[in-house]
């Protein structure tokens, strides 16, 4: 029966790809046996309860092979992937897009496609399982004991982010992470040996992984035995499964020609004959459905029923802990976070917003029991350490400080995996200039609606001596162009607390909080509440103003000083703090026009970064004072002076150009 079911996976994938005239049949045909073995003999899922917190997680890191996953989900009885949806593969509005999308199709545990990120995301899922198990499991009550499985390809293994995350997983000894490596020696451009020649298992052993070789990837039983062996390891496991890409296609198997193009009518006919498949396209025999029902759906429903009974008994035995867990899983715990949760500085005091952020992190940690995070080897520079907790590792599983190492990209993908798993709220920090290293993962945070909080410090040329390699210029503009994300650049400690509060109240997108190294004064009129509007009046001496200064972050205090200087010559100035462009854009037309009246054309923006965005607010007849060249190495005050961000220089520029 197993071979017939394996062939059904292959044929269903080939048929859907042919119908779409687009897709990647090679991985479907080559990896079908290992995927069948995993789904029918190991994977613990309930198609009727796709959000079961203790289900096994499955990540198809080789996301281009999406029809492999859709075939499995359809055959296993996941309602979102009906036969009609399989036929609509890669079509507008379907549940079967070109690459798997979390939240779009029930049964998909992660959005994948950008190679390498699936492996890395799975590391985060495994970390979440270990953390929650250590925190909530009690003797006889293993509420959290699931595995995280991955199918990846050569392209994933080549990607640097997979190396970063695999190294991290080994340090953390995430032994419930099992990666099935579809090793077929072919990539899109040809044979992998032309670009990729290392011994992958030796590499992973050097990281500290357990490794297993399956020489015959067509053997369901060999893969099954390897997974059984992996489950006994005290390390994460890489199972290298030697396969033939496009297996069964007489003229194209084993070649790059079957990687990313439909087989077509003629080759499909030969393929069907080769494997002895006589059914019409999309006609799956009843005994195949019965096989998957018995070995995936029914088995999974049985496992879920046992877990439900266990959870009910747990609630009776540990009612307070169960109540906390339910609040965490439903995100109801966020409701306990309020303005009163935070501490505030007095007007006239000064504090770097990175330090204000540290205060906020610890305020949030005091309220949310599963809130944790870390930094890419910069915790004492980013100020991301949760006080009273130590480093989280295999021996200290419930501590709340994660040392990600110098692995920005992996850090962000691990954060995504943690949030995809559920039951935690997480953050990660690095220098703002290094946000470029992780932007691919931040983009997937946004695409998957994941409320990850990114902490970016050292936000401008005020970094000073470290020079242009460490001084962000284009980075604010770049982050602001990513859809479905909030970017905050707070002006002082008050706005920083608000940014953290709003980041935790947000459940459908990531937040980037961009912070200073240098001290900033606590402003007289900065407002915790008004940050939610994205922009608000922070200084004004006359309702009859004729000039608007718009600023963010450290430049808000500068703008207020500039306003006072301009007023000496008769100008009447409104200063607007705009900590979040995205939140401001969500406001009503009336609020926007009230804040930035259309009849006031004397407008200036101040931000130590790329100036392009600001013409939207100051107009072509306004003045956008920014930095559109790289920074320099010198003491911070000298760099700031040379780049014209002093009261005198800004006032002179306004007078000369407006």
Placement of each model-derived feature along the sequence:
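A short, small-residue-rich loop immediately preceding and capping a beta-strand
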Residues: 20, 56-57, 108-111, 141-159, ...
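Cofactor-binding active-site loop characterized by glycine-rich and histidine/acidic residues
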Residues: 30-172, 385-386, 414, 418
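A glycine-rich helix N-cap at a beta->alpha junction
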Residues: 78-88, 171-182, 205-209, 446-461, ...
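Short glycine-enriched loops at secondary-structure junctions
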Residues: 89-95, 375-381, 388, 406-409, ...
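Thiamine diphosphate
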Residues: 91-103, 121, 127, 131-135, ...
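Acidic-glycine-rich active-site phosphate/pyrophosphate-binding loop
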Residues: 1-10, 43-45, 82-104, 379-393, ...
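Conserved acidic/glycine
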Residues: 1-31, 151-152, 156-157, 178, ...
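Short, surface-exposed connector motifs at secondary-structure boundaries
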Residues: 51, 147-148, 208-211, 421-427, ...
């Amino acid at each position: 029966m197993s071979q017939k079911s394996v062939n059904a996976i292959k044929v269903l994938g080939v048929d859907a790809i042919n119908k779409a005239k687009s897709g990647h049949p090679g991985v479907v045909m080559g990896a079908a046996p290992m995927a069948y073995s995993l789904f029918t003999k190991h994977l613990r899922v309930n198609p009727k309860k796709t959000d079961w917190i203790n289900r096994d997680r499955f990540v198809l890191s080789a996301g281009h092979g999406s029809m492999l996953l859709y075939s499995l989900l359809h055959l296993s009885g996941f309602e979102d992937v009906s036969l009609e949806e399989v036929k609509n593969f890669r079509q507008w509005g379907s549940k079967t897009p070109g690459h798997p999308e979390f939240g779009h199709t029930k049964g998909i545990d992660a959005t994948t496609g950008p190679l390498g990120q699936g492996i890395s995301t799975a590391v985060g899922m495994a970390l979440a399982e270990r953390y929650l198990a250590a925190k909530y499991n009690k003797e006889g009550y293993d509420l959290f004991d699931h595995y995280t499985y991955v199918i990846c390809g050569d392209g994933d293994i080549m990607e640097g982010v997979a190396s970063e995350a695999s190294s991290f997983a080994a340090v953390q000894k995430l032994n419930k992470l099992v990666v099935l490596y579809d090793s077929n020696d072919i990539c899109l451009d040809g044979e992998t040996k032309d670009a990729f020649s290392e011994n992958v298992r030796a590499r992973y052993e050097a990281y500290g992984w357990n490794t297993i070789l399956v020489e015959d990837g067509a053997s369901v039983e060999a893969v099954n035995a390897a997974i059984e062996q992996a489950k006994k390891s005290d390390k994460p496991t890489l199972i290298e499964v030697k396969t033939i890409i496009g297996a069964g296609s007489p003229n194209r198997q084993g070649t790059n020609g079957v990687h990313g193009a439909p087989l077509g009518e003629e080759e499909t006919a030969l393929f069907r004959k080769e494997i002895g498949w006589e059914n019409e396209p999309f006609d799956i025999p009843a005994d195949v459905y019965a096989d998957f029902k018995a070995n995936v759906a029914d088995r999974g429903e049985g496992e879920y029923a046992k877990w439900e009974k266990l959870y009910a008994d747990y609630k009776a035995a540990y009612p307070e802990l169960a109540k906390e867990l339910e609040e965490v899983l439903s995100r109801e715990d966020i409701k306990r976070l309020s303005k009163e949760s935070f501490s505030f500085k007095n007007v006239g005091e000064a504090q770097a917003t990175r330090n204000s952020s540290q205060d906020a992190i610890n305020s949030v940690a005091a309220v949310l029991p599963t809130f944790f995070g870390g930094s890419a080897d910069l915790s004492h520079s980013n100020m991301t350490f949760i006080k009273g907790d130590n480093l989280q590792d295999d021996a200290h599983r419930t501590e709340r400080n994660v040392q990600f190492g110098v692995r920005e990209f992996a850090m962000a993908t691990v954060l995504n995996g943690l949030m995809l798993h559920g039951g935690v709220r997480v953050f990660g920090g690095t220098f703002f200039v290094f946000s470029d290293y992780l932007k691919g993962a931040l983009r997937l945070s946004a695409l998957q609606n994941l409320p990850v909080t990114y902490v970016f410090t050292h936000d401008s040329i005020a970094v000073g001596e470290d020079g242009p390699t460490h001084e962000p210029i284009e980075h604010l503009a770049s982050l602001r162009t990513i859809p479905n994300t909030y970017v905050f650049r707070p002006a002082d400690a008050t706005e920083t607390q608000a940014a953290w509060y709003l980041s935790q109240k947000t459940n459908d997108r990531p937040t980037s909080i961009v912070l200073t190294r240098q001290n900033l004064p606590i402003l007289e009129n900065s407002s915790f509440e008004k940050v939610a509007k994205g922009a608000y009046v922070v200084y004004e001496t006359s309702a009859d103003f004729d000039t608007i200064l718009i600023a963010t972050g450290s430049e808000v205090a500068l703008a207020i000083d500039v306003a006072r200087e301009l007023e000496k010559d008769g100008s009447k100035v409104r200063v607007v703090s705009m900590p979040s462009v995205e939140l401001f854009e969500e406001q009503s037309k009336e609020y926007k026009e009230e804040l930035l009246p259309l009849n006031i054309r004397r407008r200036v923006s101040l931000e130590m970064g790329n100036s392009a965005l600001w013409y939207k607010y100051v107009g072509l007849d306004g003045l956008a004072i920014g930095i559109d060249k790289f920074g320099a190495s010198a003491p911070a005050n000298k760099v700031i002076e040379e780049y014209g961000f002093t009261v005198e220089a800004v006032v002179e520029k306004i007078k000369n150009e407006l």
